Amino acid sequence: TIPYSRLSNDCELISVRIAKTEDKLESTIKSLGSLKEDEYRAREQLTEIRTILTDAKAKIKSYKIPVLPKNYFVELSEAKEGINEIIAELDKKPIVISDLNTRVDTGRDLVLKLYTLSSELTKTAGLAEMAIVYANRYRSSYKEMDMTLEKAEKEFLSGDYKKSLETTLNALNRIEPGIHKKLISAFES
């Protein structure tokens, strides 16, 4: 027979062990819940990032830019790679949340950079085209304007929209000082 005091002591030890195990289990369950929330949040952000990428590409397609600069394709490739890295990180088991968060941040930054470039390209190309069209009214009256517009059109068709815009506005400002403000205002409205 086992003495009662020993049984009581053993029961107390077992009770303490069970309490510690319950605490560890509760902590683990909370941690798993947090990991699931982080994974879910990352998947939501991936969806948002993909939407931004789609919007950036649609912006370029909608304007029908004649020539896209090489850096656009580099940034597009980097953005797609950033998304692929997020997907690869989400497919890993177990997921390392710190790595996943880094991939999501990097992917978002790359896609936003592409979106910004797309916006700038379409705005600059649109403004350059508008300036050339506006300047055409002076083409027959001013020989220098005709030559300048030929140069600006070549720059435009080669994809150097910023240079084309600068060339056209410089020529227009000689004939109509301050016209660039009116053109920008008209373009933005």
Regions found by a protein language model. Give the residues of each.
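Long, charged/polar, soluble alpha-helical segments
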Residues: 1-189
